[in-house]
Amino acid sequence: MASKYPEEGPITEGVEEDFNSHSTSGLDLTSVGKNPEHPRRILLVLQHLIAYAEATIKKQDVPGPLLPILSPYVMAWDNPQNVVTRLVNLGESWKKYLLSPGWKDCGERDLTMLTRELLVPGIGLVQIAATLTKTYVLMCNGRCITGSRTDPDCDPLFCKLLCWKQNIQDPRECNLEEWCLYSLDPEHDPLWDPKMIVRRHRNLLPYCMRPFLIWMNYISHNPLTQQCIMMKTLNMLWRAQADDPSDVASLYPRVKVFKASHFDIFGSASGNSEERVSWAKENSHRGEYSLLPSSDDEEEEMSEREELLCHINQCQQKLFYPGGTTDVLGMESNVWLTKFVNIKFPKGTKVILPDGRKFIACDPELKPLLQELKFLDRATSESSDSE
């Protein structure tokens, strides 16, 4: 299967990478460490992500035990098109490493990956993947330790990192269940385990066998994220009341989400269009599919003014609130979102984004949001009069 991602650039030797040489959107990787508040907030997000992932997986009734101990290590990488990667040790300073992306097509039989895709305000799309395996170790080709670039699939930094942590001189001796390195094929790697079947993707991720990987994948780059933006949100992470990240019960109910099995809009094949429409019609009595955090108590009916917080300016991509404007950072284009809502939802469905933008599904040829525009003028006028 051909890779969906373009060819990556050369991998630079050395652990400390110059992040200024990479262009990314969403989370500014160069700002980490400069703003003392930034790492703390991101680490808080990662901690809550782990708790949220646990709750999500428990609801799947997955047979067999998950890895019992959560590792403090969380692997995060920004975009499949870049090799910029950050390995975060929760509670300690951020460390910079290089990894190769591309695990999307991996895994059958011995390897099971459960994924959830979520939108973190101010960060971008985050994909959580939990791994369940019978065989934990995929051996790494020995040339990695020498840093040879003759093999484009080789990731020397990752191999050096793991072997250094385990005090192993030759990565072929790394037969520990704590780590999982990638292999090439039986011809290149005599220690290839034929029982471990992996459908190889170019630059197959040397995925860590700790249970959770967090993929920070920014909306403006990957077309998959363009299809994910209406899905699950982690807006609740900024508002959650739980002091303890393990207090899953106080986190999980705070977000209303679509059923991924029916609203699978990020490339997988679970749930066809008929099933999605059927599910939407069955739940149409709710009147709206809200991605906003919900209260733990009974839901209070939103007033018209609260529902219509904003409308879309398709040129400047601004949020227009009564009394002021706010820039939209890292969000997908309003034109695309309008088309998406019209295609994916029955006519008349109200969809509210975490940032307050509201869409009403209509026939694609109709001009959308006329009511919102009229309401905005009235609300802005009322706000100005009150001031």
From Swiss-Prot:
Q: Which domain of life is it from?
A: Viruses
Query: Region Disordered: start and end of each range?
Result: 1-33
| Function in brief | May be implicated in the establishment and/or maintenance of viral persistance. Bet is required for viral replication.
Q: How does it assemble?
A: Bet interacts with host APOBEC3Ca. This interaction does not induce APOBEC3Ca degradation but prevents its dimerization and incorporation into virion.
According to UniProt, the name of this protein is Protein Bet
What gene name does this entry carry? bet
